[in-house]
Amino acid sequence: MIHASPVRLAAVVVLGGAVALATSACGGPMQAGAAAVVQGQRTTDATVQDQVSSIISLVQKNNLQQGDVTDAQRAALGKAQISLLVEQALWQRAADDEGLEVTSADDAKEQSALVEQDRATLGGKQFTGSDNEAVALADAESQSASGLAPSTVPIYAHVQALIRAVVNEQAAKAHLDPNDQNNVPALQSALQPVLVKAAGEIKVKISPRYGQFDASTAQVVAAQASWIRPTKAQIAAAQQQQDASNGMGTN
């Protein structure tokens, strides 16, 4: 079944509201055709629609969705694509403020762990898709699904690597073991000012089509109805692309 919730964290610490903090830095008119502009990087409506189409195609191909995809599901998937970009900007800024560097090797290590974990999860189904599709499908099956599209798995892995670096840095400063559940409250307290500072520094604009801002909670509230309606042709095209990718053995 298609569903999406805020991006899961690789670290043991889960910060409720970490995503929401980033949405406070916004304003100004949207560029034509833009779904979001995050730190000056423009993501188009077409890109988001393609990502949503690829998720729908993946879950339908693997019989996870019964019946038609609802407006609420489409809205959640569209918002999830934007939320991932905001997450990336927030944690990248936090890492930069702390003087931390996350390398491509760190990203590769994180993605490799995700692929190994998620392929094991799908093992009983003898999943033959690409590594990125395996991660996206395992995400779709989980109770904490974040609405990952196969094409955004590398971004997701980078976000996890950023989170891990920032959490470990704050844990070291506070002389805390980040893997000890008893330290979660203390780590949350240590991370809060870091994320608040980062949230005030990033620049985020989101199209009202994907929701609206609640100033009282600094959260993006999803639109009640979704304008994202992938056509059968778009879903079929996404299916063909996935099949072609599987045939070539690519991610």
What are these regions, as identified by a protein language model?
Residues 106-123, 181-206:
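Short, mixed-charge aromatic SLiMs
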Residues 29-142:
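N-terminal targeting/tethering segments
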Residues 126-174, 179, 192, 205-209, ...:
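Proteostasis/folding factors centered on peptidyl-prolyl cis-trans isomerases
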Residues 19, 33, 88, 154-155, ...:
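A broadly tuned, weak detector of single residues within folded domains
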Residues 1-73, 189-251:
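Short, low-structural-confidence N-terminal segments
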Residues 50-77, 152-185:
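Well-structured core secondary-structure elements of compact alpha/beta domains
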Residues 8-11, 79, 155:
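Alpha-helical transmembrane segments of integral membrane proteins
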